[in-house]
């Protein structure tokens, strides 16, 4: 399935919850979901009760949309998580959390994962001193993510840094805004990812049908 390229706010309305896909805008009066908190389309206000399958499908879609991952790639992440030892739910969360675009967002160098993905694709970051332009690149604990020297004057990055200085950092990353550098300290535990508004077990059940 190709990556969605339509209106971003439409995704929040479709899922029936605010997914904070536009960063700061989602906290303002301009948020489309706050204005129209129902699904798009002529019958958007008639959202019925979901079946068990529908609930599982929506959980999968919400997580996939939040992290900006195409369908086939997300399915690949699940298959990999299933084959790893330990809790499949935690494995899945750890796989998507260790993507470089997500860590760029977690560090505060972008105001949203969507913006982080664009910035990574355009080559504005390095990992351990090597330029990286693949958003899905998997980081390992101890990897250092840095804004490249020539990119530190970008308005988008400077704005993100200023906006993030007072933000509480998640405990699995560490950032030094003065040097435009951050470290992926460790893999997060499932219960630490408190801003993921889905039941990951429902996703496991969806793929285990």
UniProtKB/Swiss-Prot annotation:
InterPro entries to which the protein is assigned, alphabetical: Ribosomal_uS4, Ribosomal_uS4_bac-type, Ribosomal_uS4_N, S4_RNA-bd, S4_RNA-bd_sf
UniProt cross-references to Pfam families, sorted A to Z: Ribosomal_S4, S4
Domain spans labelled S4 RNA-binding: 98-158
GO cellular component terms, semicolon-separated: small ribosomal subunit
GO molecular function: rRNA binding; structural constituent of ribosome
GO biological process: ribosomal small subunit biogenesis; translation
SMART domains for the chain: Ribosomal_S4, S4
Keywords from the named record: Ribonucleoprotein, Ribosomal protein, RNA-binding, rRNA-binding
Record text on subunit structure and interactions: Part of the 30S ribosomal subunit. Contacts protein S5. The interaction surface between S4 and S5 is involved in control of translational fidelity.
Function summary: One of the primary rRNA binding proteins, it binds directly to 16S rRNA where it nucleates assembly of the body of the 30S subunit. With S5 and S12 plays an important role in translational accuracy.
Protein family membership: Belongs to the universal ribosomal protein uS4 family.
Protein name: Small ribosomal subunit protein uS4
Record organism: Pseudothermotoga lettingae (strain ATCC BAA-301 / DSM 14385 / NBRC 107922 / TMO) (Thermotoga lettingae)
